[in-house]
Each structure stands twice: as structure tokens, then as C-alpha cells.
């Protein structure tokens, strides 16, 4: 009789304290032994020789648009794409599904879809808007991992921005609930006026868009949100931080004891404004991609541990919504399949960024911050979530490689070094050699209180 359900043998295992060659034994979906050599047999044995075994990534920021906007993306296609990139879990945003996740009814509607269709594990953000302050308690009871708010227009009329009163009262409530708030930080008045002025003068190109959302709009708003968090005691996460100066504000606040973190997104590390001019609307996002000097500074902040985690901000749409003048088209980038490969290429190979830190940025920290118990690292008692990686395999991303509903991404045609050959969720292989090999087995993740 097999002693274990699964043994991974001979892998280079990316543990929290370093990379070491080891075997990993799994029973009942959990890691039960990590040793240089594990004797005996198992129901399944995987030879990971020559591979690096990473903890499966958790993407803290995706828009899978389900239910209600399934012509853009679905939980089925989005979670499959995530698995193909080494992903085992995601936290889905309260928009751009329709209706938005602003109360228990719509939370449960989304949960029902995920229970049926999600290949990987999932958590859900609740929304905080000026219209649903009375719904925060019921969303907390549903098990949201936190709340998301926009300081500027969200792009979705049914998800109104958080004004200052909502910020104050909402953060006071969330502090009592013990749940974090993530804020999209851009100054509403400045972005609105600059955008309207640009459109009135028929300035609708790439650089016009950048000029309408300059760095100060993020920097100023990050400073203000930190002040609200400091006064209320609410845990704050700055979403998709794009400027090094804003990262510095977060680091300074943390140094004085404020419970604040920031996430960044791959495109702020890999792309510059020049790339956006070349790529066009497929690379439009908000906040916009910045210049090369800021990008270099962002890498410095990553090396200095001032950025807590890296997500994809996967925000697809119907490709028709990307047709037209840059200023007017939908802003959002499809990227959840390439987060780990991007970091292996641009961080590890190009900049000698440690593999352990990549695992922290994509798996460990996000689960710790959101209090997801037993997930995010290769350690005893944790979920047996693994991404098997060939560090030196080079490939050019093709549209047909993508599992998204629409085979669109600014990274199509890019050369990557470091590929995912197999993804394992709680001991079950869900992706292998370019194919999804499992039925949906995702489970709902709730914060551990």
C-alpha cells in the first residue's frame, strides 16, 4: 500500500529559506514531508529532476468578469490561463462582473459560478463605494478577502468612486471588521479635468493619455489614503502602484507603524511609455505605464523589499472595445498567464533577482497579508501547490498559447526564458505540457480570523 498520495522527486525546491534539492511527499492535498530523499512509494510519483519547484502562485488582482460580462472573460477561461502560468489561486475583483460584488446577493451569485467553473482556488474582493456602506458587514460574513475602492472614476458607472466621507467611514468599519482595503489611487479631480481638456482639444493619442494621468495624480492620492489609514487603523493596500515616489511614501509610512502595503504589476516593470506607443491600445491601462527612468527606480524598490507582492491586474475586454483613439478605448491588460514567466525572465535572468524573492512576491506574501492559512509556500502542513519550472527553457509567446477567452496580450511575440511545465493544486495536476488536464477543483478561500 502506498504510504503517500504523491511524491515529487529530485526537484530544486524553492523553500522560504532557500533553494535546495529535495523530495516532497503529499497526503490529502498537504505537504507532509520535505527531505533530501524520501524512501518508499506513492500512488503517484513525479520526477522533477532538472526542474525548479515553486509554490503555485496566487494572483491577488484579477478581473474575470463573471457573471455578467462573460463576453470579456469567464472564470473558466481565466482560471485556466492562470493555471497555465503556474497559478493555483486568485482573488477576483468586485468589478467588472455585472452586477458588481457590492452585497451578499451578488457575492453568492459569483460564488456559485466559481464553485462550478473555477479550475483553481479563489477568493473574492467586496466593493466599497459611496453607495454600499451599509453592506460591508454582510460581505464580510460572506468571506470576502478584503474590499476594493476607487479614488477616481472606476470606468464602470455601477461602481461609483469612494469620496472622502466614504473613505473615512468605510475605513473605520473595515478596521473593526479586521479586513483590508485596496485602493486604486489616482486623484479624481485632476484626472477628470485633464482628460476633459485633452478630449476638448482633440488630443487623444498615447502621450496625451499619459499627460492626463501624470505621476502626481497617484503620488498625491497615495499620500492621502495613507493618512486615512493611519488615523483609522485600517489595513491599506495600494493597488497596482506605478511610481517609485509612491512606493517611497508607503515605505515611509510602514517605518512609522502604518499597516500599509503596495502591490505592483508586471507591466510597470517590463514596459515603458515607448513600448506603449509601439504596441498601441493593447497596452493601455490605468494608472498608465510610465517612463524608463521610473521603471529603473521601480526595480530598485523591488530589490529593497518595499513592494509586497506582484499581481497581473488581468483586465480583459471584448477586443472591439480596444478599437479607436487611445484616449477613448477601454483600459486594461490581459496578463494572468505570464506573471511568473515574466519575473523569471526580467527579474531572475536579466537582473539576478533571487528565486526565493520571486516566490515571496507571487505566493507567500499575498497569502500572509490576506490571512489565507496554509497556502503560499512550500512548507510542512501547507497545501501541496506547485509550479514546476524549467528555468532555462526559452520560448516566444504565441497567441494560440493563451487560454484567455480572447487571445490578446501585449506580451504576444515576446521572448521568455523560464517556462511552466506543470501546475499542481493540492496534490492534483491541473496543467501539464500546454494542456489543462483536470476538471474544475477550485475551493473558496476565506481569511483566517
From Swiss-Prot:
Pathway: Nitrogen metabolism; (S)-allantoin degradation; allantoate from (S)-allantoin: step 1/1
Gene Ontology biological process terms from the UniProt entry: allantoin catabolic process; purine nucleobase catabolic process
GO molecular function annotation: allantoinase activity; cobalt ion binding; zinc ion binding
Record's keyword annotation contains Transferase: no
Function: Catalyzes the conversion of allantoin (5-ureidohydantoin) to allantoic acid by hydrolytic cleavage of the five-member hydantoin ring.
Name assigned to this protein: Allantoinase
Residues the record lists as N6-carboxylysine modifications: 148
Cofactor: Zn(2+)
E.C. number(s) listed in UniProt: 3.5.2.5
Family, per entry: Belongs to the metallo-dependent hydrolases superfamily. Allantoinase family.
PANTHER family linked: ALLANTOINASE
Record note on quaternary structure: Homotetramer.
Binding-site residues for Zn(2+) 1, renumbered to this chain: 61, 63, 148, 313
Post-translational changes noted in the entry: Carboxylation allows a single lysine to coordinate two zinc ions.
Gene that encodes it: allB
Catalytic reaction(s) noted: (S)-allantoin + H2O = allantoate + H(+)
Biological source species: Desulfitobacterium hafniense (strain Y51)
Keyword RNA-binding set for record: no
Amino acid at each position: 500500500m502506498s504510504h503517500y498520495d504523491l511524491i515529487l522527486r529530485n526537484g530544486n525546491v524553492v523553500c522560504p529559506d532557500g533553494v535546495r534539492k529535495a523530495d516532497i511527499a503529499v497526503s490529502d492535498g498537504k505537504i507532509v514531508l520535505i527531505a533530501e530523499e524520501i524512501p518508499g512509494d506513492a500512488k503517484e510519483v513525479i520526477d522533477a529532476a532538472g526542474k525548479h519547484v515553486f509554490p503555485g502562485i496566487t494572483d491577488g488582482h484579477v478581473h474575470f468578469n463573471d457573471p455578467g460580462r462573460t463576453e470579456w472573460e469567464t472564470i473558466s477561461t481565466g482560471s485556466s490561463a492562470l493555471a497555465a502560468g503556474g497559478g493555483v489561486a486568485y482573488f477576483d475583483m468586485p468589478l467588472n462582473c455585472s452586477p458588481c460584488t457590492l452585497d451578499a446577493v451578488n457575492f453568492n451569485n459569483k460564488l456559485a459560478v466559481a464553485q462550478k467553473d473555477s479550475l483553481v482556488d479563489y477568493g473574492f474582493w467586496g466593493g466599497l463605494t459611496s453607495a454600499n456602506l451599509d453592506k460591508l458587514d454582510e460581505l464580510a460574513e460572506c468571506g470576502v478577502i478584503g474590499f476594493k475602492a476607487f479614488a477616481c472614476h472606476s470606468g464602470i458607472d455601477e461602481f461609483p468612486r469612494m469620496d472622502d466621507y466614504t473613505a473615512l467611514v468605510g475605513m473605520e468599519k473595515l478596521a473593526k471588521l479586521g479586513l483590508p482595503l485596496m485602493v486604486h489611487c489616482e486623484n479624481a479631480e485632476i484626472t477628470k479635468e485633464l482628460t476633459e481638456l485633452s478630449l476638448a482639444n482633440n488630443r487623444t493619442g498615447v502621450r496625451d493619455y499619459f499627460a492626463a494621468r501624470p505621476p502626481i495624480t497617484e503620488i498625491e492620492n497615495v499620500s492621502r489614503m495613507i493618512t486615512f489609514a493611519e488615523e483609522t487603523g485600517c489595513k491599506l493596500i495600494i493597488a497596482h502602484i506605478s511610481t517609485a515616489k509612491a512606493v517611497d511614501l508607503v515605505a515611509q509610512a510602514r517605518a512609522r507603524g502604518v499597516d500599509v502595503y503596495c502591490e505592483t504589476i508586471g507591466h510597470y516593470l517590463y514596459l515603458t511609455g515607448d513600448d506603449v506607443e509601439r504596441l498601441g491600445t493593447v497596452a493601455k491601462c490605468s494608472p498608465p505605464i510610465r517612463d524608463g527612468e521610473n521603471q529603473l527606480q521601480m526595480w530598485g524598490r523591488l530589490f529593497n523589499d518595499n513592494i509586497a507582492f506582484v499581481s497581473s491586474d488581468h483586465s480583459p475586454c471584448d477586443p472591439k472595445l480596444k478599437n479607436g483613439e487611445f484616449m477613448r478605448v477601454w483600459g486594461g491588460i490581459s496578463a494572468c498567464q505570464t506573471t511568473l514567466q515574466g519575473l523569471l525572465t526580467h527579474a531572475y535572468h536579466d537582473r539576478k533577482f533571487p528565486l526565493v524573492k520571486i516566490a515571496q512576491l507571487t505566493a507567500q506574501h499575498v497569502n500572509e497579508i490576506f490571512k489565507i492559512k496554509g497556502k503560499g509556500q512550500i512548507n510542512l502542513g501547507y497545501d501541496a501547490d506547485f509550479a514546476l519550472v524549467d528555468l532555462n527553457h526559452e520560448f516566444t509567446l504565441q497567441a494560440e498559447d493563451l487560454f484567455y477567452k480572447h487571445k490578446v496580450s501585449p506580451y504576444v511575440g515576446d521572448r521568455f526564458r523560464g517556462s511552466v511545465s506543470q501546475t499542481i493544486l493540492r496534490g492534483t495536476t491541473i496543467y501539464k505540457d500546454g494542456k489543462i488536464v483536470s476538471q474544475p477543483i477550485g475551493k473558496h478561500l476565506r481569511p483566517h480570523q
